[in-house]
């Protein structure tokens, strides 16, 4: 980035999102925002992830003038049930048991906030996963091996989690990991950021 180009900041503590953003070969910094991620009453999953992505970016805006802040949030949805990060083994096993044999939608909210202009671009990018029918012992083994306790839906698609799936459907496979790079590059281009290619 040049001196005239705003700093790029990833508003996340996720190592997975940092690894994804590294793919773009852009210099960036990262910082974890401190926000309440509770779902509002009657808030749709789409509205939830878009709001949280924007709030994550806004939470760091005052500290970072002339910065492009990337906020992102993801939930898994089975029917009307929203699944977040399990946090513990038992919840991960319950989430994967609920997903067994079903189609699960992963909704990723993405926000790019320009703190110099106040302009924000916000979107929800869906990605769908058809899970294989899984036996309880398979689920327990997977959770014990991969420890997906900080991942929405209780799996890591970039690792052993891929064996849990029958089919994938979506615009950008990076969305499943938590950062839709195709849309992000469009947002960055709209802000005048020159990508390496």
Curated annotation (Swiss-Prot):
* EC numbers on record: 3.6.1.-
Q: Which residues form the active site?
A: 73
User: Where along the sequence does the record put site: Important for substrate specificity?
Assistant: 16, 74, 158
Q: Name the source's superkingdom.
A: Bacteria
Q: Which reaction does it catalyse?
A: N(7)-methyl-GTP + H2O = N(7)-methyl-GMP + diphosphate + H(+)
Q: Which CDD domains match?
A: Maf
Q: Name one GO molecular function term.
A: nucleoside triphosphate diphosphatase activity
Q: Which cofactor does it need?
A: a divalent metal cation
Kindly report the protein's main subcellular placement as a broad class: cytoplasm
Example GO BP: nucleotide metabolic process
| InterPro entries per record | ITPase-like_fam, Maf-like
For this UniProt record, the keywords arranged alphabetically read as follows: Cytoplasm, Hydrolase, Nucleotide metabolism
- Enumerate the subcellular locations listed in this protein's record, separating them with semicolons: Cytoplasm
Spell out the coiled coil positions from the record: none
Query: What cellular component GO annotations does this protein have?
Result: cytoplasm
Functional summary from the UniProt entry: Nucleoside triphosphate pyrophosphatase that hydrolyzes 7-methyl-GTP (m(7)GTP). May have a dual role in cell division arrest and in preventing the incorporation of modified nucleotides into cellular nucleic acids.
- HAMAP family assigned to the protein according to its UniProt record, in alphabetical order: Maf
Family membership, please give it. Belongs to the Maf family. YceF subfamily.
**Protein name as annotated:** 7-methyl-GTP pyrophosphatase
**Native source organism of the sequence:** Alcanivorax borkumensis (strain ATCC 700651 / DSM 11573 / NCIMB 13689 / SK2)
Q: What broad taxonomic lineage does this protein's source fall under?
A: Bacteria, Pseudomonadati, Pseudomonadota, Gammaproteobacteria, Oceanospirillales
